[in-house]
């Protein structure tokens, strides 16, 4: 867009020739906004591209005092900064990916638009940087306050590898974010969002306000980037800044986690987990929020998706202490571990019948944490734990045998916590452990040498602990086997058990 003779720049400083009146400048920006909105509504790219070209020319032709100071007459001094904020919002929306009618994740048209828009953001931020060093442009702070939120959302949308980005658009978005941090004098995303001190409140609330219209049930899928921007931004904010925004961040996180697509479920659960570990228990217990979280997470355990199960179990393990506090406060200390018992019972039910290796691995990976959490109360589940342990020891998990290593870790913990209940199970457990050692020794299992060594060591430790729980019964039962066995690996393990004097590992009560 040309401003005719009024585009001539003055020789020094940040002033625009007086021939260009502030109302004319506002009108020019309004016309560009109209062009961008028309492209959004009609889907015609020409209007949007022309508007981008006009905007670039207008930014270059306008000096910083006119760009940030507002009207020169009787108008409000906030008008131009507010208009710049509207322009920034329009640019961010123009470059954002849109939901495809056919459900496709490809957005071939977006990277080029994002690159052009990114260059315009660089020009706008460049004007701010120039104004900061000019004594005649004091209103740059107001302008930056309106620009920073949309600029940040644009940069986070396009800076990482996504279906709607290209290396070029990622590079430009990265430059935009770097320049934004420079002009705001922030050294990190966390400082930008949270502020440096009590006087600087940060921009997290501003970003949430801009995202809010796009994070309700009707709109959150129209822009496939918004969930990623929300999730990534949320996880940059930690204690103690997060709790004051709880009412704004909890509903979108629950909404995303409740979707039918697994990727969205996992993303939502990760958001919920971040909230659980960064918001005080008192805030989570207020208005029964913790119970809402628990029921939402518990229902996900019925989904046979290993990534989702992993995210949910990790979140629940951090949520249990919050739920226990509520029961303690209600004078029900005896029922404090009720939720953990419920989850472990369901997990064991799924483990008994699960045949998919990824899910078996996920369940086994998290089982030790539940045993540690319950401690001696694990005895309530001992019969079912025994069946799960015996079943999982029979199936290898190539290439690292992670499932059996975690099951052996679980067995050690169970024996340490529930040792009075172990003597009656000595024979069953001894047979399972010896069979495992023999299978490893015969080299019939396609796992790595490191995994085989680790399994042998863990199995031997379990035998030593089993012997201590049974007051030496295992050594007596192994005596004849050591004499008749000709496999050096098996004999070596037996000799370690026979020569042991103390149970391996530390007392779990010291954790």
From Swiss-Prot:
InterPro entries: ARM-type_fold (IPR016024), Tti2 (IPR018870). It holds the Pfam family Tti2. Residues 1-10 have a biased composition (Basic and acidic residues). Residues 1-21 are annotated as: Disordered. It comes from the Eukaryota. SUPFAM superfamilies: ARM repeat (SSF48371). One of its GO terms (cellular component) is TTT Hsp90 cochaperone complex. Belongs to the TTI2 family. Regulator of the DNA damage response (DDR). Part of the TTT complex that is required to stabilize protein levels of the phosphatidylinositol 3-kinase-related protein kinase (PIKK) family proteins. The TTT complex is involved in the cellular resistance to DNA damage stresses, like ionizing radiation (IR), ultraviolet (UV) and mitomycin C (MMC). Together with the TTT complex and HSP90 may participate in the proper folding of newly synthesized PIKKs. Component of the TTT complex composed of TELO2, TTI1 and TTI2. Interacts with TELO2 and TTI1. Interacts with WAC; WAC positively regulates MTOR activity by promoting the assembly of the TTT complex and the RUVBL complex composed of RUVBL1 and RUVBL2 into the TTT-RUVBL complex which leads to the dimerization of the mTORC1 complex and its subsequent activation. This is TELO2-interacting protein 2. It comes from Rattus norvegicus (Rat).
